[in-house]
A protein has these predicted regions:
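Multi-pass membrane proteins that catalyze or facilitate reactions on polyprenyl-/lipid-phosphate substrates
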Residues: 1-4, 10-265
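Single conserved hydrophobic/aromatic residue that forms the stacking wall/gate
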Residues: 262-274
Length: 274
């Protein structure tokens, strides 16, 4: 949930490196066919995501304002810690085709990084822009499911990142609750539509083209680290923050790598990729 709040960081990436990505896709894809199982799997993650977004929007904004380099370094570490578990099942499949898929995935994410962005005030929204909010929610949810592409980057491209963050913060205040809901409801509708669409497509690709899919995912994940590092360059570098940043990278790496080791100790689909 917190990963989805930071431009350049993908919630899909965090799902991959913690080992729940394929199960997440399957649960969304078969939500109505296997309702009870899907809800039992998705409910804890849903509660965690909603809680993190509601409580984390202000915290992340404050951390990025006060200690941007350590904060982004922690997320670089989180992402880097998942690379070994992604590399392991594909290490014997380095054909030219797969390498091209990897490079294509990296390139796709970097294209999003260098697209021009804008932002608008929540008070400037026109009636037609609620359709744009729905469309941005749809595309952002597709991006969130796809590892490496940040959903928040989509909102920045549409110019609604600050509008979204203000609306999320406004949910906690009675005076701004209704205004926040008028912004978040069309976004939520778009997110749900995009989520079901994207999960169906990506689940099919993982089943039919597992090796190629994991090369693409690895490319997305590597590129997402480049995106976060690139955004760090916009901040003034200080030696103390740099040292703390390195510590945070190591901390994030160790946490995610430990979680990935727990995941691969269980039977997984990764073992079937050969």
């Amino acid at each position: 949930g917190i990963a989805n709040l930071i431009p350049g960081v993908s919630g899909g990436t965090m799902a991959v490196i913690t080992g729940v990505y394929e199960d997440f896709l399957e649960s969304i894809n078969h939500f109505f066919q296997d309702f009870r199982r899907s809800v039992s799997f998705l409910l804890p993650y849903g509660i965690g995501i909603i809680t993190a977004i509601l409580l984390g929007s202000r915290l992340i904004a404050k951390c990025l304002e006060v200690v941007p380099i350590p904060t982004m370094s922690l997320f670089i570490g989180f992402i880097a810690g998942g690379v070994p578990v992604l590399y392991r099942p594909i290490q014997k499949n380095f054909q030219i085709k797969n390498i091209c898929i990897f490079l294509g995935a990296v390139t796709l994410v970097l294209i999003f990084l260098f697209l021009p962005t804008a932002d608008k005030s929540a008070t400037d929204l026109q009636p037609y822009e609620y359709i744009l909010l729905l469309a941005s929610g749809f595309l952002a949810s597709v991006a969130m499911v796809l590892p490496g592409i940040s959903g928040m980057m989509i909102f920045m491209l549409f110019g609604y990142y600050q509008t979204l963050m203000n609306a999320l913060s406004g949910l906690l205040k009675a005076s701004t609750l209704w205004h926040s809901l008028t912004i978040l409801i069309p976004i939520a509708i778009g997110v749900l539509l995009g989520l079901f669409t994207a999960c169906r497509i990506f689940s099919h690709l993982l089943k039919k083209y597992p090796k190629q899919s994991y090369f693409a995912i690895l490319g997305f994940v590597i590129a997402s680290m480049i995106c976060v590092f690139y955004k760090m360059l916009a901040y003034e570098f200080q030696i103390v923050q740099g040292i703390v940043g390195l510590i945070m990278v190591l901390l994030g790496f160790c946490i995610t790598y430990y979680l990935s080791l727990i995941h691969i100790s269980e039977p997984t689909r990764h073992a079937q990729i050969s």
